């Protein structure tokens, strides 16, 4: 079905499919947008009045993008920050749903921030750090620089990317 610019567009498409009685296409629409096929069934059965709320549509888009990118580790935490912002702010949900806003670009901004703000890890920490190398536990060797943004910076970068703040 392609990319939707808003939850309203998504719900209008769902409304058309419901009016045609096309439950199978409605289920496909739901799954393509990170929702469950059961959400489509609930919509057709009249249990809910729309296929997706603003939060469901935004979280669904992020879920689909996250899966495609194989998001894991610290980037999973960064992704979760977007969902948390959506839960707190309907305008943020709308911004996430916009065409041209993508999780990969937000992640790229966080990685750029991480690189630009890296700091050396203390030698005191490194000399007691063990790492697996070739299947063997060894002392960490060499300098290490980290620049992982704190939670406040992650939120700030998310708001700047998605909302332009």
Language model features with spans:
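Low-complexity, interaction-prone regions
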Residues: 1-79, 163-165
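Short, compositionally biased low-complexity segments
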Residues: 47-57, 80-83, 124-135
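Charged, amphipathic alpha-helical linker/scaffold segments
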Residues: 57-116, 120
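Long, highly charged low-complexity segments enriched in Glu/Asp and Lys/Arg with interspersed Ser/Thr
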Residues: 117-165
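Phenylalanine-focused residue identity feature
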Residues: 1-4, 92, 115, 140
């Amino acid at each position: 079905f392609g990319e939707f610019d808003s939850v309203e567009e998504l719900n209008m498409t769902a409304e058309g499919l419901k009016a045609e009685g096309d439950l199978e296409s409605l289920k496909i629409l739901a799954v393509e947008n990170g929702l469950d096929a059961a959400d489509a069934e609930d919509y057709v059965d009249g249990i809910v009045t729309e296929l997706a709320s603003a939060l469901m549509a935004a979280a669904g888009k992020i879920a689909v993008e996250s899966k495609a990118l194989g998001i894991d580790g610290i980037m999973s935490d960064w992704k979760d920050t977007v969902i948390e912002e959506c839960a707190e702010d309907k305008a943020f949900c709308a911004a996430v749903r916009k065409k041209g806003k993508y999780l990969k670009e937000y992640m790229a901004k966080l990685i750029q921030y991480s690189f630009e703000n890296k700091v050396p890890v203390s030698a005191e920490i490194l000399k007691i750090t063990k790492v697996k190398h070739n299947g063997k536990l060894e002392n960490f060797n060499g300098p290490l620089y980290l620049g992982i943004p704190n939670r406040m910076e992650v939120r700030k970068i998310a708001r700047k990317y998605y909302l332009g703040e």
